[in-house]
Amino acid sequence: MGSVKSAGLSLLLLSFILYVVDSYPSMDLSNMGCEECTLRKNSVFSRDRPVYQCMGCCFSRAYPTPLKAMKTMTIPKNITSEATCCVAKHSYETEVAGIKVRNHTDCHCSTCYFHKI
C-alpha cells in the first residue's frame, strides 16, 4: 500500500512540474521591455491632429575588438559595438503650436545617425 501512495505522489508531483514548465512563457526574453521598431502616436505633439514617430528597438551587439583592428585605432578601445536604430523611412514636415516637427509615415531599422550620450 505504501508503494502505491509513493507512486501516486510521484505522479502528482511530475504532473505539477510539467504544468509549471508548460505554462512558462516560451518567448525570446533578450529584448524584454523594448518593443519592435514601429510607428507610434507621439502624445506630446498630437494635440489638434495626430503626429506619428518611429519608436522601438533594433539590433545591437558588442564584442571584443580584434587585435588587428586595435592596431589601426588612434585611441584603442577593447570593445567594439554595432547597432541599428529605429528611423523613419518616409516623413514630412508639419507644424504643431508654432513648432516644426517631422511626422513619420514609415519606419525601419537602419544606420544610427544620432546617439544618446
Curated annotation (Swiss-Prot):
<feature type="disulfide bond">
    <location>
        <begin position="85"/>
        <end position="112"/>
    </location>
</feature>
<feature type="disulfide bond">
    <location>
        <begin position="54"/>
        <end position="107"/>
    </location>
</feature>
<feature type="disulfide bond">
    <location>
        <begin position="37"/>
        <end position="86"/>
    </location>
</feature>
<dbReference type="Pfam" id="PF00236">
    <property type="entry name" value="Hormone_6"/>
</dbReference>
<comment type="similarity">
    <text>Belongs to the glycoprotein hormones subunit alpha family.</text>
</comment>
<comment type="subunit">
    <text>Heterodimer. Glycoprotein hormones are heterodimers composed of a common alpha chain described here and a unique beta chain which confers their biological specificity to the different hormones.</text>
</comment>
<feature type="disulfide bond">
    <location>
        <begin position="58"/>
        <end position="109"/>
    </location>
</feature>
<dbReference type="GO" id="GO:0010469">
    <property type="term" value="P:regulation of signaling receptor activity"/>
</dbReference>
<dbReference type="GO" id="GO:0006590">
    <property type="term" value="P:thyroid hormone generation"/>
</dbReference>
<dbReference type="GO" id="GO:0016913">
    <property type="term" value="F:follicle-stimulating hormone activity"/>
</dbReference>
<keyword id="KW-1015">Disulfide bond</keyword>
<keyword id="KW-0964">Secreted</keyword>
<keyword id="KW-0325">Glycoprotein</keyword>
<comment type="function">
    <text>Shared alpha chain of heterodimeric glycoprotein hormones. These hormones bind specific receptors on target cells that in turn activate downstream signaling pathways. Involved in gametogenesis and steroidogenesis.</text>
</comment>
<dbReference type="InterPro" id="IPR000476">
    <property type="entry name" value="Glyco_hormone"/>
</dbReference>
<keyword id="KW-0732">Signal</keyword>
<dbReference type="InterPro" id="IPR029034">
    <property type="entry name" value="Cystine-knot_cytokine"/>
</dbReference>
<dbReference type="GO" id="GO:0016914">
    <property type="term" value="C:follicle-stimulating hormone complex"/>
</dbReference>
<feature type="glycosylation site" description="N-linked (GlcNAc...) asparagine">
    <location>
        <position position="78"/>
    </location>
</feature>
<dbReference type="GO" id="GO:0005615">
    <property type="term" value="C:extracellular space"/>
</dbReference>
<dbReference type="GO" id="GO:0007186">
    <property type="term" value="P:G protein-coupled receptor signaling pathway"/>
</dbReference>
<dbReference type="GO" id="GO:0010893">
    <property type="term" value="P:positive regulation of steroid biosynthetic process"/>
</dbReference>
<feature type="glycosylation site" description="N-linked (GlcNAc...) asparagine">
    <location>
        <position position="103"/>
    </location>
</feature>
<keyword id="KW-0372">Hormone</keyword>
<feature type="disulfide bond">
    <location>
        <begin position="34"/>
        <end position="57"/>
    </location>
</feature>
<feature type="signal peptide">
    <location>
        <begin position="1"/>
        <end position="23"/>
    </location>
</feature>
<protein>
    <recommendedName>
        <fullName>Glycoprotein hormones alpha chain</fullName>
    </recommendedName>
</protein>
